């Protein structure tokens, strides 16, 4: 009998930056990948050519979330993991309706993973003890709060709390953990002054790049014991 085909890993927000790096990491390991994307960046075409299943999704409404879930539920054998990487960033700015800012942040960071975890639960179960994973990507600000991004920080804190609740609900078949990154990589338009200020906020004074995230994700996927925990990736920033 031949070796069973690996189950796919679902990555939300896989069209760019960390999500894209994770997708390519798994593809290079011959691991099937399902990627959600909102905007069709050129990188999506590369993923499709490499064999990834890429599904355009609108997580700004619950109907959009459930439509995406319905597509994923067509997977006949199940899922190896769900990596909740999709994110948005909004600040409380003059002229921006505060209720809209809060609703947007809660929709993408709370409603979306909450609904997907429930809708896709049966795809994660039935594969054995600690055989499946959910990883939530939260943020360093969960620990400290943010006076400029209050709604964002609150929504990521809610996601952090859901990590422990889903860990209780889904154990021992499914492990549920979160990763709380600070500065991982810069945007192309970030100028030298901003970059230096950002680097000085941590003890390690570097932007480690996607590999630091990939290594931690690999650890969590291979562990058969760790669940219900949040793992900071902040370079010692909490000690500054």
UniProtKB/Swiss-Prot annotation:
The keyword Zinc-finger does not apply. The keyword NADP applies. It is an enzyme of class 1 (oxidoreductase). One of its GO terms (biological process) is one-carbon metabolic process. Keywords: NADP, One-carbon metabolism, Oxidoreductase. It catalyses: (6S)-5,6,7,8-tetrahydrofolate + NADP(+) = 7,8-dihydrofolate + NADPH + H(+); 7,8-dihydromonapterin + NADPH + H(+) = 5,6,7,8-tetrahydromonapterin + NADP(+). Its EC number is 1.5.1.50, 1.5.1.3. PROSITE patterns: ADH_SHORT. It comes from the Bacteria. GO terms for molecular function: dihydrofolate reductase activity. Belongs to the short-chain dehydrogenases/reductases (SDR) family. FolM subfamily. Catalyzes the reduction of dihydromonapterin to tetrahydromonapterin. Also has lower activity with dihydrofolate. This is Dihydromonapterin reductase. The lineage of its organism: Bacteria, Pseudomonadati, Pseudomonadota, Gammaproteobacteria, Enterobacterales. The gene is folM.
């Amino acid at each position: 009998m031949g070796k069973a085909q690996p189950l796919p890993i679902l990555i939300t927000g896989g069209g760019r930056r960390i999500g894209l790096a994770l997708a390519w990491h798994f593809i290079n390991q011959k691991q099937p990948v399902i990627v959600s994307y909102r905007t069709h960046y050129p990188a999506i075409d590369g993923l499709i050519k490499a064999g990834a299943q890429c599904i355009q999704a609108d997580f700004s409404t619950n109907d959009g979330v459930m439509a995406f879930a319905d597509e994923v539920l067509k997977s006949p054998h199940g899922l190896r993991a769900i990596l909740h990487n999709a994110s948005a960033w909004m600040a409380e700015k003059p002229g921006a309706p505060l209720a809209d800012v809060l609703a947007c942040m809660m929709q993408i960071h709370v409603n979306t993973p909450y609904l997907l975890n429930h809708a896709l639960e049966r795809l994660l179960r039935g594969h054995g003890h600690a055989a499946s994973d959910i990883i939530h990507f939260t943020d360093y600000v969960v620990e400290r709060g943010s006076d400029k991004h209050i709604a964002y920080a609150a929504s990521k804190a809610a996601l952090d709390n859901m990590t422990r609740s889903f860990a209780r609900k889904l154990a021992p078949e499914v492990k549920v953990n979160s990763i709380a990154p600070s500065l991982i990589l810069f945007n192309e338009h970030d100028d030298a002054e901003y970059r230096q200020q950002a680097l000085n906020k941590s003890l390690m004074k570097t932007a480690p790049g996607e590999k630091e995230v990939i290594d931690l994700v690999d650890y969590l996927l291979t562990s058969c014991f760790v669940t219900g925990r949040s793992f900071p990736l902040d370079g010692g920033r909490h000690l500054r």
